[in-house]
Amino acid sequence: MTSSPVPVQTDLRPVLSRLAKGEHLNEEEAFAAFDLIMRGQATSSQIAALVMALRLRGETEAEMGGAVRALRSHMIPIKAPDGAIDVCGTGGDGAGTLNISTAVTFVVAGCGIPIAKHGNRALSSRSGAADVLTALGVQIDLGTERQEAILHDEHCAFLFAPHFHPALRHAAEARSQLGIRTLFNLIGPMGNPAGVKRQLTGVFDPIWAAPMARVLGELGTETCWIVHGLGLDELTLAGESQVTALENGSLRQFSVTPEEAGLPRAPLDTIQGGDADHNARVLQALLDGADGPYRDTVCLNAAAALIVAGQTGTLKEGVALARRSIDDGSALSALNRLRAATNAIP
């Protein structure tokens, strides 16, 4: 991924004209176009036209790489504890499940792994990470310095994207009005402001797994799993999931099944979610010890996160650690500590 200077883009219309002809942008051109968006120099109509043109024609790895670089160039960075990871998904899968990665956050934190959970409110679903955390009583509207302090003190924090990526406000109206997945869904998980070197990322379409892993590697990520499970941006209990792993500078692609982790299969409808309040109640019940497919799904994904974190080497061992985190109250304690820290008067 080149870091050569790029021309300053001052008007998105020439780019739109090229895309209308079916042309591709190279990485530097994509950087310039998205940099213009981040600087507030494109209208909502132009932004919507750009991301829809890319989606209809098919986004390229170079375009994704340039867009990620633009996103990162405008973010407010913080420093994470050593060994910190992120667990998130692109969204946009349209499945309407319970919040998986948010629950995984507390299970993994309960295992002693620092976790800088990066996320937003729902844009193309009913309940995003920010929505369910708010319903759980976690205060997300905190300054970046306060969140950095919480991350270091509690080893668990939610990095609310609008606070760390203020430039994305210029695209908010277009994204909300479109209400569908776009390139922004792909680049969001690659813009963790804490600069984590390890992450578990779910993707709405497995075609993007290898490109995302390569781009993350070029941006300094050491280990990541990009996962997709039968339409979900998560590992699933419903059948076989696809994984693209970046490890030691190399990509490895493989599939995993619930049986490999020692878990029973369960259909997708067993983890159907609702609004933020409903999903928060179910997540709280999970941390309080409730059993069932939701717990198993969370444990499966937590196991993957623990492998990425270097805590274990197999899914079966990871599931055992995840179950212990829930059963001994460590996961619940992680939520309670985060809730208390974010609501404390500084």
Curated annotation (Swiss-Prot):
SUPFAM superfamilies: Nucleoside phosphorylase/phosphoribosyltransferase catalytic domain (SSF52418), Nucleoside phosphorylase/phosphoribosyltransferase N-terminal domain (SSF47648). Mg(2+) 2 binds at D233, E234. It is an enzyme of class 2 (transferase). Binds 2 magnesium ions per monomer. The keyword Cell membrane does not apply. Its EC number is 2.4.2.18. Pfam families: Glycos_trans_3N, Glycos_transf_3. 5-phospho-alpha-D-ribose 1-diphosphate binds at residues 89, 92-93, 97, 99-102, 117-125, 129. Pathway: Amino-acid biosynthesis; L-tryptophan biosynthesis; L-tryptophan from chorismate: step 2/5. Its cofactor is Mg(2+). The keyword Metal-binding applies. It comes from the Bacteria. Catalyzes the transfer of the phosphoribosyl group of 5-phosphorylribose-1-pyrophosphate (PRPP) to anthranilate to yield N-(5'-phosphoribosyl)-anthranilate (PRA). Belongs to the anthranilate phosphoribosyltransferase family. This is Anthranilate phosphoribosyltransferase.
